[in-house]
């Protein structure tokens, strides 16, 4: 059940002939070599990545795979960009364990271009002296701002080869500026490529979340034991007691936590009275504590890579602790330097409870 749900793409050599032509070029090109795969949703990028990696392994090359498709992640954990070094043939990318991951914090890249580009670049740089060939799998976001994301990734990563999987020249406008300096292969989307509905994609993601968080434990981590990032709540300095009293009196709130940074207050509160309040959110931003329930957080090491993910079960503002459910070991917990808040809420059964806007916390 898990394998059937989680794995969309499998290793097969029953693919169009033009894939073998691209493989031949890769085989004969000077190493090390960086390859980016581009294509829309359900265009066969992951199937192609699986094929290329296996064939190149068979030829004796050291291969690295950077999985940056945060919406339909093959190499767990979800909501991250992952680097893996497969050493032997594999059936699908789900079988491969990540070597390093970078936390994005969402399955929707639209508001996270910085994380998408930074993570992909850092992992490619890390792999460059450890592999002959780096294969970068990408999201299916190729129109609108998605085209900008692909352009910026190409500019930052500087691949040697781009393989574009197209139906009707939809990638030509993105890639035309690069054609004179990067080898670009335009391949047709395989006519038998399987399509997945939005609901099927959601079910696949649910199985991946559930698989990742099985065998998890609860850890309580103090505010002062780590850096807490990815939220404005802990930026700047904690508000003073007289400031807290004034705000509570003025707006009839119970303030659980408050901070101020660069002239702006951020308050976590509960309403004591149901009443209209005229508040300039550029000066005073307020958050209900429930917004943090079941929030995905990244557990970050000293090198800014993601050790693993956690589900933020509760924030105890009174005792200044975070209650986090995570499958990582107690030994790895000791290596956490930052807990970075994401923007997707998920329960331990894999159910996605909703995405948050980047500025909402």
Curated annotation (Swiss-Prot):
Listed name of the protein: Polyribonucleotide 5'-hydroxyl-kinase MJ1315
Q: Which GO terms describe its biological process?
A: RNA processing
Recall the taxonomic lineage recorded for the source organism: Archaea, Methanobacteriati, Methanobacteriota, Methanomada group, Methanococci
EC number(s) on record?
A: 2.7.1.78
Q: What does this protein do?
A: Polynucleotide kinase that can phosphorylate the 5'-hydroxyl groups of both single-stranded RNA (ssRNA) and single-stranded DNA (ssDNA). Exhibits a strong preference for ssRNA.
Q: Which GO terms describe its molecular function?
A: ATP binding; ATP-dependent polydeoxyribonucleotide 5'-hydroxyl-kinase activity; ATP-dependent polyribonucleotide 5'-hydroxyl-kinase activity; polynucleotide 5'-hydroxyl-kinase activity
Q: Which domain of life is it from?
A: Archaea
Which major enzyme category is it?
A: transferase
- Reaction(s) the record says it catalyses: a 5'-end dephospho-2'-deoxyribonucleoside-DNA + ATP = a 5'-end 5'-phospho-2'-deoxyribonucleoside-DNA + ADP + H(+); a 5'-end dephospho-ribonucleoside-RNA + ATP = a 5'-end 5'-phospho-ribonucleoside-RNA + ADP + H(+)
The cofactor required is:
a divalent metal cation
What InterPro entries would the database entry show?
Clp1/Grc3, CLP1_P, P-loop_NTPase
Give the residues the record marks as binding ATP.
Answer: 39-46
Q: Which UniProt keywords apply?
A: ATP-binding, Kinase, Nucleotide-binding, Transferase
Q: What organism is the protein native to?
A: Methanocaldococcus jannaschii (strain ATCC 43067 / DSM 2661 / JAL-1 / JCM 10045 / NBRC 100440) (Methanococcus jannaschii)
């Amino acid at each position: 059940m898990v394998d059937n749900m989680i794995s969309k793409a499998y290793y097969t050599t029953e693919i169009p002939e033009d894939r073998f032509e691209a493989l031949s070029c890769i085989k004969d090109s000077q190493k090390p070599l960086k390859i980016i795969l581009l294509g829309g949703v359900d265009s066969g990028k992951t199937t192609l990545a699986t094929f290329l990696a296996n064939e190149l392994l068979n030829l004796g090359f050291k291969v690295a795979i950077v999985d940056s498709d945060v919406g339909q992640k093959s190499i767990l954990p979800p909501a991250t960009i992952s680097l893996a070094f497969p050493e032997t043939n594999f059936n699908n990318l789900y079988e491969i364990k990540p070597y390093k991951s970078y936390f994005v914090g969402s399955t929707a890249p639209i508001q996270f271009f910085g994380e998408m580009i930074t993570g992909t670049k850092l992992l490619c740089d890390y792999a460059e002296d450890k592999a002959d060939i780096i294969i970068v799998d990408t999201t299916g976001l190729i129109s609108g701002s998605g085209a900008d994301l692909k352009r910026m990734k190409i500019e930052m990563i500087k691949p040697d080869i781009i393989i574009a999987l197209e139906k009707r020249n939809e990638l030509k406008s993105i890639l035309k500026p690069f054609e004179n300096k990067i080898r670009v292969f335009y391949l047709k989307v395989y006519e038998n490529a399987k399509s997945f509905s939005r609901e099927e994609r959601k079910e696949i993601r649910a199985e991946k979340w559930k698989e990742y968080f099985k065998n998890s434990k609860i850890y309580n981590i103090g505010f002062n034991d780590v850096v807490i990032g990815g939220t404005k709540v802990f930026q700047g300095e904690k508000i003073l007691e007289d400031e807290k009293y004034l705000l509570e009196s003025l707006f009839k709130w119970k303030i659980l936590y408050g901070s101020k940074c660069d002239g702006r207050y951020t308050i976590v509160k509960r309403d004591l009275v149901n009443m209209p309040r005229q508040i300039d959110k550029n000066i005073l931003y307020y958050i209900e504590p429930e917004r943090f329930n079941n929030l995905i957080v990244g557990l970050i090491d000293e090198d800014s890579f993601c050790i693993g993910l956690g589900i933020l079960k509760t924030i105890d503002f009174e005792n200044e602790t975070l209650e986090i459910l995570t499958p990582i070991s107690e030994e790895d917990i000791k290596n956490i330097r930052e807990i970075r808040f994401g923007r997707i809420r998920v329960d331990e059964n894999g159910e996605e409870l909703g995405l948050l806007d980047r500025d909402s916390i």
